[in-house]
C-alpha cells in the first residue's frame, strides 16, 4: 500500500463521524462508570481491600462491560488495566492475584491515583483521577472534615487545574468565533500554560506528563506503537533536568558578569521544533498532567520500585511491540505468544487477561521478553532530586550519589480524553462527575488562567459536554448492561 493511500485510510478512520463518536462515547461511559465505583470503594472500603484486590475488581467489570457491547466488533476491551497508585507511585501498580506486592493498604492522608481505560473498535477513552483517603470524622463527637493542606494539596490543585485549563484551551478550537479569545491553539502555548500553573503552585511537573493527539489504536501506549504525524507536548526526565541545569549555568555566568550570548539549551530548541503544531477541530486529545509535591529547586526522576524490602517486584503489565518478530524455540513461549496474538491488541495488558493460570503463563515469558516481543511496564515511583545533586552529577556522572540524594514525593495526576468536534468539546472522561478532593492551598491561579477557565460555558463561547457514568452494578454476580 502506498504512503498516500495509507495516510488517506488513517484520516478516514479518524474522522469524527457519528459512528466513530458513538464508539468513543461508549468507551468513555464504561470508563467513567468503572471509575465512579472504584472511587467509592477506595474512599469507603480502603481498610477492607488491598490495592491489588480493588484493581482486579475494576478489571473484571471492564471485561464484562466491553464484552456486552458492540457484539460484531472484535477489537474492543481494556485499553489500560486498572491501576491504583498511592503517594509516590506513578506507574505499573496493578497486582495479579498471588503476587507478593499487592500495592499495600491505603491509609488516611494518602494521595491515590486511579487510572483505567477502554477501547471500542480502536477508539480509546482513558482517565486518571486523584483522590485523598480520609478518616471519617465522628460528627457526634464534634469532629469535622478537614482539608488536606501543604505541598501535597498544592500538587492536587496544580494537577487538577492544569488539566482543566488545557481542556478549556483546547475547547477554543470549537468556538463559533475562533481565535477571538485566545488566538491559534498551539502545542507551544499548551506547555507554557501547564508550566505557568506548576510555577504558581510551587510544584514540579512529573516526567511522562503529556498532552497528545489520540487516534484509532494510537493512544500513547508507552511509545511502543510508532506514530506518523504525531502531535503532542511531552515532559521528559532528561529534558527537564537539562533545562534546570541550563538555568543554573546562566545564573552563574550572569553572577560572574560573563556573556550569555549563544548559550543555548538544546532541549529547549528541540521542544520548540517538536511542539510547533496547531490544534484543530475534528481531533481527539488525551490530557495527562502529573504534579509532584516538591517546592524546592531540582527535578523529578522516575525509578523502578524494588519492593519495600528491596527484593524486587514482579512486573504484571506488558505492551506488545509488533515491529519485533522472532522464531521462539521454547514450547511454553510459543504457546503463550499464540494466546497473546489471539487475545491482545496494541494496548497494555496483564497476563491474567490472557491466561487464567498466571504462574503457567510466566513459564513462557522469559524467552519472549529476552527477544523484546513484549515490553515490560515496571512499577515506578517519583523522587525529587535536589538541584545541587543534579549539578554534581552533570560534572562527575556519579549516578549513585544523585540517586542517594533523591527523596520520594507524593504525586497527583489528572487525565482526560476529549473530542474536539465542530461545535463542542466532548469530554469522554473526567469532568463534573469527578470533582477534585477536599484540599486547601495557600497559592492561587494567575488571573489569565482564571479568565481562560471562565471561557468554558460562556453563552457566546466554546462548550464542553461531559460523558456521564452509567448506572451499572460492578458486582460479578449481576449482569452488567450498557446501552450502545
Curated annotation (Swiss-Prot):
Biological processes, Gene Ontology terms: proteolysis; ribosomal large subunit export from nucleus
Subcellular location: Cytoplasm; Nucleus
Record-level GO cellular component terms: cytoplasm; nucleolus; nucleoplasm; preribosome, large subunit precursor
Source organism superkingdom: Eukaryota
Top-tier EC class: hydrolase
Entry keyword set: Cytoplasm, Hydrolase, Metal-binding, Metalloprotease, Nucleus, Protease
Quaternary state and interactors: Component of the nucleoplasmic and cytoplasmic pre-60S ribosomal particles.
UniProt-recorded name of the protein: Probable metalloprotease ARX1
Organism: Yarrowia lipolytica (strain CLIB 122 / E 150)
Name of the gene: ARX1
Amino acid at each position: 500500500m502506498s504512503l498516500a493511500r495509507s495516510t488517506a485510510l488513517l484520516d478516514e478512520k479518524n474522522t469524527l463521524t457519528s459512528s466513530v463518536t458513538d464508539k468513543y462515547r461508549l468507551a468513555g461511559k464504561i470508563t467513567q462508570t468503572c471509575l465512579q465505583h472504584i472511587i467509592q470503594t477506595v474512599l469507603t472500603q480502603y481498610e477492607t481491600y488491598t490495592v491489588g484486590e480493588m484493581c482486579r475488581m475494576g478489571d473484571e467489570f471492564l471485561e464484562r462491560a466491553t464484552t456486552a457491547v458492540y457484539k460484531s466488533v472484535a477489537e474492543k476491551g481494556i485499553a489500560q488495566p486498572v491501576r491504583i497508585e498511592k503517594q509516590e507511585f506513578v506507574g505499573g501498580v496493578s497486582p495479579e492475584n498471588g503476587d507478593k506486592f499487592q500495592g499495600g493498604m491505603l491509609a488516611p492522608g494518602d494521595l491515590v491515583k486511579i487510572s483505567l481505560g477502554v477501547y471500542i473498535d480502536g477508539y480509546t477513552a482513558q482517565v486518571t483521577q486523584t483522590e485523598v483517603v480520609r478518616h471519617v470524622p465522628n460528627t457526634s463527637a464534634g469532629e469535622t472534615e478537614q482539608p488536606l493542606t501543604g505541598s501535597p494539596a498544592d500538587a492536587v490543585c496544580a494537577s487538577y487545574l492544569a488539566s482543566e485549563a488545557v481542556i478549556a484551551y483546547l475547547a477554543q478550537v470549537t468556538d463559533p468565533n475562533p481565535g477571538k479569545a485566545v488566538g491559534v491553539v498551539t502545542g507551544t502555548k499548551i506547555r507554557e500554560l501547564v508550566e505557568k500553573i506548576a510555577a504558581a503552585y510551587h510544584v514540579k511537573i512529573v516526567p511522562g506528563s503529556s498532552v497528545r493527539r489520540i487516534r484509532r489504536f494510537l493512544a500513547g501506549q508507552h511509545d511502543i506503537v510508532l506514530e506518523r504525524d504525531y502531535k503532542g507536548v511531552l515532559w521528559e526526565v532528561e529534558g527537564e533536568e537539562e533545562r534546570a541545569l541550563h538555568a543554573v549555568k546562566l545564573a552563574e555566568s550572569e553572577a560572574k558578569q560573563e556573556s550569555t550570548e549563544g548559550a543555548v539549551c538544546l532541549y529547549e530548541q528541540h521542544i520548540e521544533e517538536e511542539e510547533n503544531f496547531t490544534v484543530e477541530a475534528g481531533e481527539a486529545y488525551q490530557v495527562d498532567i502529573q504534579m509532584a509535591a516538591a517546592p524546592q529547586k531540582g527535578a523529578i526522576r522516575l525509578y523502578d520500585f524494588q519492593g519495600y524490602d528491596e527484593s524486587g517486584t514482579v512486573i504484571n503489565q506488558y505492551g506488545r511491540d509488533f515491529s519485533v518478530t522472532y522464531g521462539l524455540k521454547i514450547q511454553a513461549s510459543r504457546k503463550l505468544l499464540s494466546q497473546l496474538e489471539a487475545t491482545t491488541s496494541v494496548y497494555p495488558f496483564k497476563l491474567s487477561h490472557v491466561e487464567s493460570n498466571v504462574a503457567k503463563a510466566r513459564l513462557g515469558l522469559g524467552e519472549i521478553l529476552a527477544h523484546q516481543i513484549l515490553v515490560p511496564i515496571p512499577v515506578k515511583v517519583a523522587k525529587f532530586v535536589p538541584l545541587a545533586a543534579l549539578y554534581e552529577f552533570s560534572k562527575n556522572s556519579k549516578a549513585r550519589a544523585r540517586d542517594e540524594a533523591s527523596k520520594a514525593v507524593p504525586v497527583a495526576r489528572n487525565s482526560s480524553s476529549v473530542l474536539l468536534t465542530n461545535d463542542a468539546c466532548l469530554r469522554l472522561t473526567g469532568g463534573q462527575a469527578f470533582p477534585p478532593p477536599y484540599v486547601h492551598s495557600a497559592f492561587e491561579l494567575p488571573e489569565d488562567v482564571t479568565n481562560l477557565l471562565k471561557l468554558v460555558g460562556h453563552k457566546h463561547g466554546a462548550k464542553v459536554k461531559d460523558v456521564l457514568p452509567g448506572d451499572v452494578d460492578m458486582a460479578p454476580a449481576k449482569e452488567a448492561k450498557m446501552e450502545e
